[in-house]
């Protein structure tokens, strides 16, 4: 992600070790109106990254649950519930029908990726997602327009025919 922050989108590496959706973090496209929107890469990990992250991921939210402040014993367990609610909220709201947005759930944080019509619409979408139950934070990587070089997220590899 450092490449994205440094100035423009980076494309996922085509070569190197295989990457999989090992942790099953929910990642779905919730709106589809902007056909040329750069498609974000989903949450993919190499085997080495999985080994490195597994322990940390198993610990997130454990102390919160032990002291009775959280319903589930791990923060990542909420994501499978949160993302469908976020999807319904965005689709039923009506203000975002002219966007192309993907949402990713990781540790009760919702990351927004994709294209919107204006900065005001981006801000409104972020605020709307904050209203969804159990969301602990929103990471807004939405862009105005469809310029792939302006994307603030890794881009998916083009589909092979």
Whereabouts are the PLM-identified features?
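N-terminal targeting leaders
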Residues: 1-161
